[in-house]
Amino acid sequence: TLDDVKALPMDAIFFMEYMKKRGYDVVFHGEYTPDFIPKYTPILLRMGVECVYTPQRQVWKYLEQYGYSFDYLFVSRVYQAQCFDRLFRKYCRRAVYIFNTVDIHFVREELEAQIFNSSLRLSNAMQTKRVELLIASQADATIVISRDEKKLLEETYGLKRIMHIPQARTVRGRSGTWEERK
C-alpha cells in the first residue's frame, strides 16, 4: 500500500497496482511530470513500476526500442493521449489501446465556457471534444467513471467499447466496520 500519494492520481495508482498484482510489467511516463520526482517516483519504483523519465530516458526513444513488446497501452486523460498518439501508432502497433478518460474533459470545458460566457473557452472545448471523441472512437476500450458518461458517449455520439469503471479508492485508517461507526 502507499502512504504518501496525495498528489498522484489515485485511479492511476489503483490501475497500476491492479496490473502489477496480475503479473503485468507496468511502465509509467507522465507528460506533465517527465522528470524524476523525488517524492513520487520512488513510490512507483517500490511498486515495481518501471518509470521512464528524463534525462536518463526520453519516452520516444524508449518506445522506439521497446514499444513492439507492449501488449497493452493504458493512457489516462485526453491531453496525455493526444500528446503520445503518434508515438503509440508508430511504435506500439500490436498493443491493445485502453483510453481512460478520467472524466470526459470536453463536457467540463463546455460547462466552464457557459459559466464564464467565453467564446474562447467554448472554442477550446470544441477542439477538446473533437480530439476526445476521436481517441475514444479509435481506442480498443474507453473507460469512464460514471454511468451518465457511458450513456452520453454511447447514445449521443454512438461510440462502442465504453466501459464504466467507477473510481476505486482504498480507505485507509478506518476506525471499525460500517456497523461500528453508525
Model-derived features: positions:
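Helix N-cap/beta->alpha junction signal
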Residues: 77, 101-103, 146-148
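A short helix->loop->beta-strand "cap" motif at the edges of active sites that frequently abuts
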Residues: 91-97, 159-160
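N-terminal subdomain of nucleotide-sugar transferases
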Residues: 1-35, 41-42
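Donor nucleotide-sugar binding/catalytic pocket of nucleotide-sugar-dependent glycosyltransferases
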Residues: 133, 137-154, 158-174
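Short N-terminal targeting/anchoring amphipathic segment
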Residues: 64-83, 96-98
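Conserved donor-binding/catalytic core segment of Leloir-type glycosyltransferases
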Residues: 1, 143, 171, 178-182
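Acceptor-binding helix/loop patch of EC 2.4 sugar-transfer enzymes
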Residues: 94-95, 99-127
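Conserved nucleotide-cofactor-binding alpha/beta core module
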Residues: 26-68
